């Protein structure tokens, strides 16, 4: 059963009323300096149709997926109940882009994904100022950061905006559904297999085996939550102040896609997937 079904409707309603009343001013709450996600322009156009909170169709038929963020899925006829967060994210994207030219800037080495969608950072101009669509969606509490943002400075910028949005406890952060899962409850983590999630807990040990580093959040490797880091990527974590062997005893928030390898697991390919939270 999805964690969505356990969220009281009155809590969601209150959260989304607050979110909707604050959306028009959310961007002003987080002023945007020179933006590190701005790179080579790869396309321009006007959005004509919106699939969900991060996917839209340009007027020439090309499909675009916003890089670096995850949003709730839109309501589906096959889904039990309703998903107001998904509809709110899609409506927010439409509000940001409808009728305006959108500039798409390269986010990853490959400009399109395996489905042929352009993967990009999107920008619009308002009052003569260029604004990041991803940053505005995060600031308005409609999206979470995946850390696949194209470069580390960009990921750090988006993570900072997400943390500010989380502290406001509005939108996605009004309920526990989209906040961090507890690493001490591996069954709850495993229930999200195949989905993007945030997981937080205290690291019990760090071990190496073959080409992999195992960051263990429990003593039972076959049941407890684990994060894996390939040794060839370890220097990137060390350069970011996250040397794997020093994580034991620290409280860490991890983001990524939940897999099952005995117990629940996230593979961390980028240091931006890990945040130290014992000093928050």
Task: Say what each PLM segment does.
Residues 10-14:
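Sec-dependent N-terminal signal peptides
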């Amino acid at each position: 059963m999805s964690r969505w079904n356990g969220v009281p409707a009155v809590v969601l309603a209150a959260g989304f009323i607050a979110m909707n009343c604050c959306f028009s001013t959310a961007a002003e709450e987080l002023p945007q300096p020179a933006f590190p996600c701005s790179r080579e322009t790869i396309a321009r156009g006007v959005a004509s149709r919106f699939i969900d909170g991060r996917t839209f169709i340009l007027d020439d038929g090309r499909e675009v997926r916003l890089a670096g963020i995850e949003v709730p899925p839109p309501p589906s006829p096959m889904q039990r109940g309703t998903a107001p967060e998904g509809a709110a994210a899609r409506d927010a994207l439409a509000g940001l882009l409808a009728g305006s030219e959108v500039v798409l800037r390269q986010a990853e080495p490959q400009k399109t994904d395996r489905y042929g969608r352009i993967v990009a950072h999107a920008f619009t101009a308002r009052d003569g100022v260029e604004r990041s669509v991803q940053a505005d969606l995060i600031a308005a509490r409609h999206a979470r950061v995946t850390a696949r943002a194209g470069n580390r400075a960009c990921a750090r910028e988006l993570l900072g905006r997400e943390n500010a949005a989380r502290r406001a406890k509005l939108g996605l952060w009004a309920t526990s559904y989209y906040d961090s899962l507890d690493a001490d409850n591996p069954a709850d983590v495993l229930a999200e297999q195949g989905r993007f999630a945030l997981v937080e807990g205290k690291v019990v040990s760090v071990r190496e085996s073959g080409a992999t580093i195992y960051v263990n959040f429990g003593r039972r490797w076959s049941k407890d939550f684990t994060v894996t880091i390939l040794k060839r990527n370890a220097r990137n974590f060390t350069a970011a102040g996250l040397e794997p062997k020093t994580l034991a005893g620290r409280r860490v928030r991890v983001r990524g896609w939940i897999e099952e390898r005995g117990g629940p697991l996230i593979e961390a390919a980028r240091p931006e997937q890990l945040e130290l939270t014992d000093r928050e």
